[in-house]
Amino acid sequence: MNKQVSGKRARIFAQQVLEIPETPYQQRSLQASLHLFHSLGQKTNFSQAEGVSPSALSRFFNVYDWDSDRCWEEMQDTQWRILLDAARHKRRPRLRLSVDLTTVEKVGTQLPYVSVYNGKHGIHLVVLFAEYGELKFPISYRVYQGKHTSTPVTLALDLLEEVPEWIKKRFQVCVLADSGFEAAAFLEGVQRLGFEFVVGVRSNRRTDHPGRVTVADCPHGGYVNLANWPLETLSLGRVDRGDREFFAVSSELLEGDDILAEGRRRWALESFFKEGKHQFGLAQFALRTAKGLDRWILLVFLAFTLTLLHRSEDMTLQETARLTLYALFPEVRLNHLLSQLQKEQEFLRQHGYSLSYTRCNL
């Protein structure tokens, strides 16, 4: 039943997306973009688009004033409502919201927001990712713009503050983050929003309890009070992965092994970073405007979300993306087929065939 509801919402959303550009010219550009970002296994490059020129797509992303903000709003509303539908008959279901920073590595000065952070040169994105059961969505993002701008911690809290009130009331929300977000300001901000958390901490993070020591001196599953955030008692999980030991704290006083299990949930976000960059084209961004970056990320999030809604164990990600495109955007498939026929006209003539087609009134 949940799959049926999710599929229905996805189809409604797909139709809403196609209607957002107001002119037929821009609608064709959007359809070509959807085909491009769902075509996994090939380079996400405007020269690969069908039905429109690379320059037309460049203007569509960088210049034209179509309402991409509305597209973001429609996508996020659909995502939250699909999560709500999935938890319809559950008592106080647990929703996990992961925040993390990833770098789309780039060089040069002509791309927007390129800076150096932690030794990496590129565009640094703080991403909010939602997970409930088998449902996994990238929801929203912020760009970290470097020194003297809002920190990743501040940007992450901004993203969490945008979670709708009706989601907060329906779900028990647990925020997952790595040690890059261990700052007291982040922990306090998460609790102020009414959320629980499991957050990584550095091995040398100091404590007031069980003494003035570091978390590395504290036992797995033990209780700790962090030195610069003594407001709450937390429980500690630790795991040795050979060359390095990792630590995390929980606001719910979970058992040590349960903390580690929650921490492993963050791999869903890590998987999105990998697939988003190398399958859905995030790493291939090369536009020179902030508007172009926002719309590029929008198409990545949209393609990933719709593909994951249709994914099954017996299909590869590439097969699922193509099936999703054809199921939700039949106009895009039709244009693709007509384009292929047009390209093969000369070949058909050489072999004595002539092919024509006409639109039927159904």
What is each model feature region?
Residues 46, 52-53, 70-71:
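Conserved glycine-centered beta->alpha loop in an early N-terminal alpha/beta scaffold
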